[in-house]
């Protein structure tokens, strides 16, 4: 893999999920990689072990003699010392998605897009290809248990990429096959309204070449609305009977989901995946559809999906000893994702009391979707809401916005037992009291609530009878 005369790549914010994946791919492809991040983490440590030079904090000195600087949408480029230093030296400065698009030119790209399900679907396709004897190159915005990381550099012709719609990043990619797994309003700091988001997804779909194909989940109304605007070959999937590839007879038992797949109205196979919930049926159908397009045998597709071990932070069971409580860590941060996670917990563990622990992510998202979060959480037996994880936003810019908006919305939606607990220590103590047999604690959010989930699992292990 070559990028002209580029040998050294500097990555600003190298510890982020998407940026660390690029760093891994570049390292495994023989490039020299340097980078910076504000704090040390397990991710930055792993990159250092692989040969990356990682600096803590941002400084003009960090860029050294690199050939290009790559930064993510989470970095305020106009305020970053490293970006400014590179521009002053005449070093090219590009966003993550542009680098991804360049790396894709060497492979047949399978790009997985959608408001929800991108990470899991990308990992399912990768696992399926590996099981079929292919050797794909893979980049996922999360940690795959099967890949033991977020990337894989293979020798085969396929490159499987998670395509992010935030900041219109996916429009820089060069897919041969494109998946649109879901679509609804999200990223209000990028898209003014749903029409702007629709336009971006149509543009993404139409980037596929004439010989490629776009796979659309028709269970989503917004996906159905944009299909007539696509001018590429299409393939539909879903639980809707009109789909080319349809799932029926869905059973959810604990962490396992089983369903029958019909292809063009004919029964094709019975499928089992180690991922609970109807939303994961959509993810698996997307993988099956791409597998059929690539000419993989049905038996190979089914066995490949059966070997899928799951994703970190995607309904990840951190503790589940028989006779004890169940602790689940989930990345859900959009109302539909929260609703799907709660439904999966209800369906898979019908005898358990479901305690939904939710940390809102971003003030802008909390403001836009507070009522929707309330409805999504209302199906839980008990709701505990933490304060907002600010991430790239500043608290001062959003006066009066807190997790209490979500807690109040949950009460209005009919939830019976709701608590807003902004203090972390108090939240941890409260949740430890719920770690008893018969309870399932579902910790959700894109922020540091994952640390709380791990602490609760440790608490359960230490207090085993």
UniProtKB/Swiss-Prot annotation:
Localization: Cytoplasm
Pathway involvement of the protein, from the record: Cell wall biogenesis; peptidoglycan biosynthesis
Enzyme type, top EC level: ligase
Molecular-function GO terms, alphabetical: ATP binding; UDP-N-acetylmuramate-L-alanine ligase activity
GO cellular component, one term: cytoplasm
Residues that coordinate or bind ATP: 114-120
Domain of life: Bacteria
GO biological process: cell division; cell wall organization; peptidoglycan biosynthetic process; regulation of cell shape
Catalytic reactions of this protein: UDP-N-acetyl-alpha-D-muramate + L-alanine + ATP = UDP-N-acetyl-alpha-D-muramoyl-L-alanine + ADP + phosphate + H(+)
Entry EC no(s): 6.3.2.8
UniProt keyword list: ATP-binding, Cell cycle, Cell division, Cell shape, Cell wall biogenesis/degradation, Cytoplasm, Ligase, Nucleotide-binding, Peptidoglycan synthesis
Annotated family: Belongs to the MurCDEF family.
HAMAP family reported for this sequence: MurC (MF_00046)
Function: Cell wall formation.
PANTHER family with a match to the protein in the record: UDP-N-ACETYLMURAMATE--L-ALANINE LIGASE (PTHR43445:SF3), UDP-N-ACETYLMURAMATE--L-ALANINE LIGASE-RELATED (PTHR43445)
Protein name: UDP-N-acetylmuramate--L-alanine ligase
Organism: Chlorobium phaeobacteroides (strain BS1)
Upper lineage: Bacteria, Pseudomonadati, Chlorobiota, Chlorobiia, Chlorobiales
